[in-house]
């Protein structure tokens, strides 16, 4: 059998899969395009990107993710609302049903790698019933060469069957959708959802379990490098600007979402990007915008005119969470090998919808650990006209849904690396200024870029700072090219007493959330706020 072949028979017996119909082995992009169109899975847009719809699930099914509770990993897992236990016998029963379902069906297999570091990468296999999910895997993971395929010894397998629905009362799931990780069997099973992000995030969870046990810091962050190789990493939850701010014309992109930090430096886990594209414009985000016009890109839930085949990135009729999946090589300025040195700067991004955090602030190491464990951002509660009450969101390590181990373990690793390499740390608010929604305005992307650039090139560090009286943050007195009054958030509010009340309210939210970490952190970190 040649790689990229279409074969009858199995070759998948090691996974318990017998009697499938056609198997598309590591098919190239063009073949997968043909299969997507032939099977009615999507449409080709006028400039070549593939448009698909995910149906009911347009985002992650957070309540439907489980980890099998088995002896090998049970004591290490941070069990709770995020990492829900699933009985081994229920997993075996459900998996047997899935293997029966696959009999007589066409399957798409992609053999690839997770992790750009030769020392830490793991060979992964994605088996799916959807051609476009195979293309997603091909975009998002690191592609194996023909020579590497000869020795590709799969360490973790994802079996993805969107049309296979669980029976909650029988199978022990919360709904018809499920994402279940079994560390003992090195297997992930996904069913009942077509949202492709589940594939990449399940392997991200696997890496977040495996690598820290080897002393490698795993991170939900983007990363880029300057002309001289100086590296910056950007932590942040979805919608805070990781992808946007790391795809900068004056820097080389290492990766946009998932990275490791070992003794040699930073390395990308992926071979592609998964960018939010709602209201994307060529002016504010030119690099990402151009990717939505390229062959090989998958546009998830983006509106398309079925006659002209033109897309509308401003149309949120399907979801606000429209996405583009594309190989990182679609970006013109990248670090080709996906690896960089030790970071010079750590930037923690937040989208503060209360409008009380500064656009940028310098953090002490203790403050950096506090904000890393807090993982704060805020979302607008509703879409009604007028003022809406923001909702604070705290997600430990800026990625709690994907962190299988205890947050303190990740924080300890990060703290040691920051101290060892004397890393400068910054907090950047890409959210509101002058008040929340309906009162203030969203921070301009151009302002955030200018502030980040000034931090990375040393301009801010060489200047003076003023101490914020509420959050204890060091705020720069000036930034070239920006109005000085926007740097201190209190100055932008017309009602200063309203600012004070809102800021202190947010401080109390921080304190309440941090109670869970006090027992495992130093007094210096616990007393930051």
From Swiss-Prot:
Subcellular location: Cytoplasm
Cofactors (names): Mn(2+)
Main subcellular location of this protein, as a coarse class: cytoplasm
GO biological process: gluconeogenesis
EC number, as in UniProt: 4.1.1.49
Cofactor binding note from Swiss-Prot or TrEMBL: Binds 1 Mn(2+) ion per subunit.
SUPFAM superfamilies documented for this protein: PEP carboxykinase N-terminal domain, PEP carboxykinase-like
Pathway the protein takes part in: Carbohydrate biosynthesis; gluconeogenesis
Molecular function GO labels: ATP binding; metal ion binding; phosphoenolpyruvate carboxykinase (ATP) activity
Known catalytic reactions: oxaloacetate + ATP = phosphoenolpyruvate + ADP + CO2
Broad class of enzyme this protein falls into: lyase
CDD domains listed in its UniProt record: PEPCK_ATP
Binding positions (ATP): 201, 220, 236-244, 285, 323, 448
Binding site for substrate: 60, 195, 201, 323
Keywords: ATP-binding, Cytoplasm, Decarboxylase, Gluconeogenesis, Lyase, Manganese, Metal-binding, Nucleotide-binding
Disulphide bridges, residue numbers: none
Residues noted as binding Mn(2+) in the record, renumbered to the chain: 201, 220, 257
InterPro entries in alphabetical order: PEP_carboxykinase_ATP (IPR001272), PEP_carboxykinase_C (IPR013035), PEP_carboxykinase_N (IPR008210), PEPCK_ATP_CS (IPR015994)
Sequence similarity: Belongs to the phosphoenolpyruvate carboxykinase (ATP) family.
Role, per record: Involved in the gluconeogenesis. Catalyzes the conversion of oxaloacetate (OAA) to phosphoenolpyruvate (PEP) through direct phosphoryl transfer between the nucleoside triphosphate and OAA.
Protein name: Phosphoenolpyruvate carboxykinase (ATP)
């Amino acid at each position: 059998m040649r790689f990229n072949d279409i074969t009858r028979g199995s070759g998948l017996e090691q996974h318990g899969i017998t009697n499938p119909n056609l198997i598309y082995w590591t098919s190239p992009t063009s073949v997968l395009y043909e299969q997507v169109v032939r099977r009615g899975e999507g449409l080709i847009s006028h400039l070549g990107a593939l448009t698909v719809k995910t149906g009911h699930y347009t985002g992650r099914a957070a309540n439907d993710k489980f980890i099998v509770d088995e002896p090998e990993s049970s004591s290490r897992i941070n069990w709770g609302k995020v990492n829900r236990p699933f009985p081994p016998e229920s997993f075996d029963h459900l998996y047997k049903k899935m293997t029966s379902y696959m009999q007589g069906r066409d399957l798409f297999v992609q053999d690839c790698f997770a992790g750009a570091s030769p020392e830490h990468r793991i060979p992964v296999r994605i088996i799916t019933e959807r051609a476009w999910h195979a293309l997603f895997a091909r975009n998002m993971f690191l592609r194996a060469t023909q020579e590497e395929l000869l020795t590709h010894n799969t360490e973790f397998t994802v079996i993805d069957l969107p049309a296979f629905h669980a029976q909650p009362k029988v199978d022990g799931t919360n709904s018809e959708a499920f994402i279940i990780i079994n560390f003992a069997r090195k297997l992930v099973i996904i069913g009942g959802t077509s949202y492709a992000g589940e594939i990449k995030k399940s392997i991200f969870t696997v890496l977040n379990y495996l690598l820290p046990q080897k002393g490698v810091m795993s991170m939900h962050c983007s990363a880029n490098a300057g002309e001289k190789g100086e590296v910056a990493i950007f932590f942040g939850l979805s919608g805070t600007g990781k992808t946007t701010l790391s795809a900068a014309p004056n820097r080389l992109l290492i990766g946009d979402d998932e990275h490791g930090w070992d003794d040699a430096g930073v390395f990308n886990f992926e071979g592609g990007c998964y960018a939010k594209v709602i209201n994307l414009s060529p002016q504010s985000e030119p690099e990402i915008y151009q990717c939505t016009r390229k062959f090989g890109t998958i546009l998830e839930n983006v509106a398309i005119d079925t006659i002209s085949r033109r897309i509308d990135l401003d149309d949120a009729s399907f979801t606000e969470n429209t996405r583009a999946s594309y190989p990182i090589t679609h970006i013109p300025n990248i670090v080709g090998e996906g690896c960089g040195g030790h970071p010079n700067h750590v930037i923690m991004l937040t989208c503060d919808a209360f409008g009380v955090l500064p656009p940028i602030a310098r953090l002490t190491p203790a403050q950096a650990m506090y904000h890393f464990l807090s993982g704060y951002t805020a979302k607008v509660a509703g879409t009604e006209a007028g003022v809406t009450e923001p909702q604070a969101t705290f997600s430990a390590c800026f990625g709690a849904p994907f962190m299988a181990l205890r947050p303190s373990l990740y924080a300890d690793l990060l703290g040691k690396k920051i101290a060892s390499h004397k890393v400068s740390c910054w907090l950047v608010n890409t959210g509101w200024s002058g008040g929340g929604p309906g009162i203030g305005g969203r921070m301009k992307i151009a302002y955030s870029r200018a502030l980040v650039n000034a931090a990375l090139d040393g301009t801010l560090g060489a200047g003076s700072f003023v101490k914020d009286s509420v959050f204890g943050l060091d705020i720069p007195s000036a930034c070239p090219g920006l109005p000085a009054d926007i740097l201190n958030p209190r100055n932008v509010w017309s009602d200063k007493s309203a600012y004070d009340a809102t800021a202190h309210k947010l401080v109390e939210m921080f304190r309440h959330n941090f109670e869970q970490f006090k027992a495992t952190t130093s007094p210096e970190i616990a007393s930051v706020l």
